[in-house]
């Protein structure tokens, strides 16, 4: 923040980024661009272009922007380089306080869900998750609790708990807190439990949050994500090559547990 305004600066060597390319990306990430101020720095043998965007968030932001700043910057770079899709799922980087790889995981489940023949568009699914950031975040926590091989290591669990505790003020709105005052504490306490108890606690919390969803269509979509995760047998999400995550996410499903899956002919 600067002078009470929220700003996003892009530094690039050689040439400025094309504004018409950047705007849709920023909008899909939950920022409305109000103004742009371009600058150029002439250095010996080097031109550095600075684009200073004044932006207005379309999703709630926490008071401490340090972690959001880093996470958003990484996501925008990956998006700009064409390594992730430019769609409304990227809004969850800010709305649900998740990183770009966690967004890719949710996007992957959506792609599979659409293949099962659900009567919703991807854009509608994107809007549904963005409208319910607490549920989106708990779906991510459910995925980690099910599949993260380090989840039961105390140091790793403590780190996950601290992250959730830091983000919960943004992700869980006042309306949810007033209706479910014990939910946050219950979820945070679950991180020190064995894996099967973590799963039970997260699923219970998801069930309570889903009871607050008024739209039948949105309820069906969000429950479908939960059921797809329960039907997942394994994933490559945590596998690394040369110390880095793979550039794709894959899942293996037990098709008998996938809800409303058409029977083979």
Regions from the language model: what does each represent?
Residues 1-31, 35-265:
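Non-catalytic interaction/regulatory segments
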């Amino acid at each position: 923040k600067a002078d009470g305004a929220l700003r996003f600066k892009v530094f690039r060597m050689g040439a400025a980024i094309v504004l018409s390319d950047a705007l849709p990306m920023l909008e899909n990430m939950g920022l409305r661009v109000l103004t742009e101020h371009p600058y150029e720095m002439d250095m010996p043998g080097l031109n550095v272009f600075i684009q200073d965007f004044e932006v207005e968030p379309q999703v709630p932001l926490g008071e401490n922007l340090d972690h959001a700043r880093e996470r958003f910057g990484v996501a925008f770079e990956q998006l700009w380089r064409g390594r992730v899709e430019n769609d409304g799922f990227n809004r969850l980087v800010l709305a649900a306080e998740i990183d770009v790889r966690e967004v890719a995981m949710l996007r992957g489940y959506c792609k599979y869900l659409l293949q099962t023949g659900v009567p919703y568009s991807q854009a509608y699914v994107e809007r549904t998750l963005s409208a319910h950031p607490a549920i989106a975040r708990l779906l991510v926590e459910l995925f980690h609790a099910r599949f993260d091989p380090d989840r039961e290591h105390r140091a790793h669990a403590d780190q996950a708990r601290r992250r959730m505790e830091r983000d919960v003020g943004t992700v869980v709105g006042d309306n949810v807190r007033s209706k479910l005052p014990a939910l946050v504490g219950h979820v945070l306490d679950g991180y020190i439990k064995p894996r099967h108890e973590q799963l039970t606690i997260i699923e219970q919390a998801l069930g309570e949050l889903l009871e607050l969803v008024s739209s039948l269509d949105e309820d069906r979509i969000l429950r479908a994500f939960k059921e797809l995760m329960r039907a997942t047998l394994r994933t490559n999400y945590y596998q690394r090559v040369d110390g880095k995550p793979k550039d794709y996410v894959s899942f293996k499903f037990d098709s008998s547990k996938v809800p409303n899956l058409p029977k083979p002919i």
